[in-house]
């Protein structure tokens, strides 16, 4: 599925006009568009045999043209997962840059092609429309050794095998919100917890460390991704279990994480209501790993002033927040149970040595802001 937002990018902050979801995974692919209040503005379904080469994307453009009337669409901004070494900030897309981004596919084999497919589709449907790529790796581009380094031969590092980090558009948005919500706190850990999950050590507003590495497979336990594991497991699977590279890739990306451990679901909501012991064990492993990595991030910054929860699980799963914070009591983290249950913005108990906040993320707004800056700056 593809999520999208339509923004006015007038003289100040971009303003959301509507948002939608394009879902081509269902038996009847569909688009649903709503206004910021949630009121439905448009819905269209197609049978699979009606779907064109570009699916429902052409339908979105047609609807947007009617919706905007005389106010033309000026650009499309894309979230691109991997920018590699060379792309440290948003860029205007052309054939050269698209080719360069496609070459990074081995670093994000499942994500990068899905990011670039809409770029190619827009290029075909609206060849004159400006397209802008915003990178999930860019927020972490300032990482320096040791946080950016693997313990591998330096010759490999010189060829780009290093820790890049991801979820940067989410971390960027939350970091901007924290300048208002917690302006005096300089050592924060942002926990983006969803189907994909990672942490960022935010020191003086900049990324100082993060849990994902070369690829989005690294770090925390995720919905279907394994996170950090002993690399020797990969050798064992190939040498002793005779698994192919493709089989190992599928196992690590699509068959591990919460789904693999629980055998029930990759969805935390399902696991929280399940009576299966393995579901509870998957949750326990998830919270154990998050808490352990929060401690690592605190070590990077030599302390911890605040812990921020965001992402689908981080924003909505009070029980998960409680379990993580209980594991961090030794760091002085204390939750207010009532505030946590309500999903309040601030959920730390009086006397907690660490501030704890829930901050909804907005990656679409980060993209809209970058698009506006590039369009205003011009070529």
Language-model segments: residues:
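Adenine-nucleotide phosphate-binding core of ATP-dependent small-molecule kinases
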Residues: 250, 257-261, 268-300
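Glycine-rich phosphate-binding loop of actin/hexokinase-like ATP-binding domains
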Residues: 139-239
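Phosphate/pyrophosphate-binding loops at sites that engage ATP/ADP/AMP, CoA/4′-phosphopantetheine
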Residues: 62-74, 178-182, 294-305
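Glycine-rich phosphate-binding loops at beta-strand->alpha-helix junctions
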Residues: 305-328
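Structural signal for terminal/edge beta-strands and the immediately following C-terminal loop/tail
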Residues: 344-379
């Amino acid at each position: 599925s593809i999520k999208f937002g339509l923004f006015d990018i007038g003289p100040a902050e971009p303003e959301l006009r509507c948002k939608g979801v394009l879902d081509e995974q269902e038996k009847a692919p569909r688009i649903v568009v709503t206004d910021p209040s949630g009121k439905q503005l448009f819905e269209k379904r197609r049978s699979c045999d009606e779907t064109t080469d570009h699916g429902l994307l052409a339908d979105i453009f047609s609807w947007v043209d009617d919706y905007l009337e005389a106010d033309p669409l000026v650009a499309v901004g894309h979230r691109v997962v991997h920018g590699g070494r060379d792309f440290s900030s948003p860029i205007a897309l052309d054939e050269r840059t698209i080719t360069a981004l496609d070459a990074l596919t081995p670093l994000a084999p499942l994500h990068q092609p899905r990011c670039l497919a809409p770029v190619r589709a827009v290029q075909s449907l609206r060849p004159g429309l400006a397209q802008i790529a915003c990178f999930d790796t860019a927020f972490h581009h300032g990482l320096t050794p040791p946080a950016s380094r693997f313990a591998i031969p330096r010759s490999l590092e010189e060829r780009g095998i290093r820790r890049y980090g991801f979820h940067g558009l989410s971390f960027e948005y939350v970091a901007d919100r924290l300048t208002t919500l917690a302006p005096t706190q300089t050592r924060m850990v942002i926990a983006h917890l969803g189907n994909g999950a990672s942490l960022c050590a935010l020191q003086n507003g900049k990324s100082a460390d993060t849990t994902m590495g070369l690829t989005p497979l690294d770090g925390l336990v995720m919905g279907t991704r394994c996170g950090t594991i002993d690399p020797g497991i990969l050798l064992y699977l190939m040498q002793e279990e005779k698994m192919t590279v493709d089989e190992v890739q599928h196992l690590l990306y699509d068959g591990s994480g919460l789904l693999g451990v629980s055998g029930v679901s990759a969805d935390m909501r399902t696991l929280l209501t399940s009576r299966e012991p393995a579901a509870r064990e998957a949750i326990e492993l998830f919270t154990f790993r998050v808490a352990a990595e929060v401690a690592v991030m605190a070590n990077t910054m030599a302390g911890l002033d605040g812990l921020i929860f965001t992402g689908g699980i981080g924003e909505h799963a009070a029980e998960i927040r409680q379990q993580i914070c209980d594991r961090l009591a030794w760091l002085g983290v204390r939750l207010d149970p009532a505030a946590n249950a309500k999903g309040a913005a601030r959920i730390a108990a009086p006397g907690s040595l660490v501030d704890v906040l829930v901050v909804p993320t907005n990656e679409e707004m980060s993209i809209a802001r970058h698009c506006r800056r590039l369009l205003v700056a011009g070529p």
